[in-house]
Amino acid sequence: MFPANWTSVKVFFFLGFFHYPKVQVIIFAVCLLMYLITLLGNIFLISITILDSHLHTPMYLFLSNLSFLDIWYSSSALSPMLANFVSGRNTISFSGCATQMYLSLAMGSTECVLLPMMAYDRYVAICNPLRYPVIMNRRTCVQIAAGSWMTGCLTAMVEMMSVLPLSLCGNSIINHFTCEILAILKLVCVDTSLVQLIMLVISVLLLPMPMLLICISYAFILASILRISSVEGRSKAFSTCTAHLMVVVLFYGTALSMHLKPSAVDSQEIDKFMALVYAGQTPMLNPIIYSLRNKEVKVALKKLLIRNHFNTAFISILK
């Protein structure tokens, strides 16, 4: 087969989960459920943050950004797969594949930057409460959020530009359900050492370094909490950090497990199932964690329900 630049390929074919015909319907149902919960949960968090003035704080600005990128990340990966399952085609155009790969890289990278910024926000709120309004003013918060998006989008562009010139070995069959960059590299028949180096550098910048910043922030937070004399004060401080810590563990745990998986013959099959967790489960659980663990969100929802004359029986469930 003659090598060709992958931009010359008009259509790519996904193998998806066709190797597992007995569980395809189950996978489709689970993915559809996860996607719907992701959409509803994250739209709910964004909406309630906008509607309730008490939630117009740095923490909820960052949380709204997290919800927004979770919607885009999940939509870029799951919605084409669900559409292909219904239509039975399992194909994607070059432009669609490139867009899907870029969105996946950009949203994942942005979250890697945004999570340590959220940890820093919690650090300032607990360790420097009197200076918090000055340090985390509106301008600073907007700059942090914009910087996170710019960093994620630029690193994704660098990775994309390193892959586009590569030549394929006449093969356009992707052993995945999405245009994941590692799955695309499996089709390349030229040396990919430069691309692998670029990806390694970006991975180090976006995984271990943010994790280190988060650990440092929470080390200071823990030290400050232990110095709080009242039990109520400690409980309140812990509650403001628990939800973020759960999201951090969920996100980085999944990301690291994808990078530290065993190098086996069927590693591509492992990649597909782990990508489902990364693209479906994590964005789905984020709004659930923040809603159930956050008293302010519950209070805001109660106010919204009362304002719109909803059934008081439903309000009592939130108590």
Curated annotation (Swiss-Prot):
SUPFAM superfamilies: Family A G protein-coupled receptor-like. GO terms for molecular function: G protein-coupled receptor activity; olfactory receptor activity. The chain crosses the membrane at residues 26-46, 55-75, 100-120, 140-160, 198-217, 238-258, 272-292. Disulfide bonds join C97-C189. It comes from the Eukaryota. Residues 47-54, 121-139, 218-237, 293-319 are cytoplasmic. It is a multi-pass membrane protein. One of its GO terms (biological process) is detection of chemical stimulus involved in sensory perception of smell. CDD domains: 7tmA_OR13-like. It is found in: Cell membrane. Its main location: membrane. Glycans are attached at N5. GO terms for cellular component: plasma membrane. Residues 1-25, 76-99, 161-197, 259-271 are extracellular. InterPro entries: GPCR_Rhodpsn (IPR000276), GPCR_Rhodpsn_7TM (IPR017452), Olfact_rcpt (IPR000725). Keywords: Cell membrane, Disulfide bond, G-protein coupled receptor, Glycoprotein, Membrane, Olfaction, Receptor, Sensory transduction, Transducer, Transmembrane, Transmembrane helix. Belongs to the G-protein coupled receptor 1 family. Odorant receptor. This is Olfactory receptor 13F1. It comes from Homo sapiens. The gene is OR13F1.
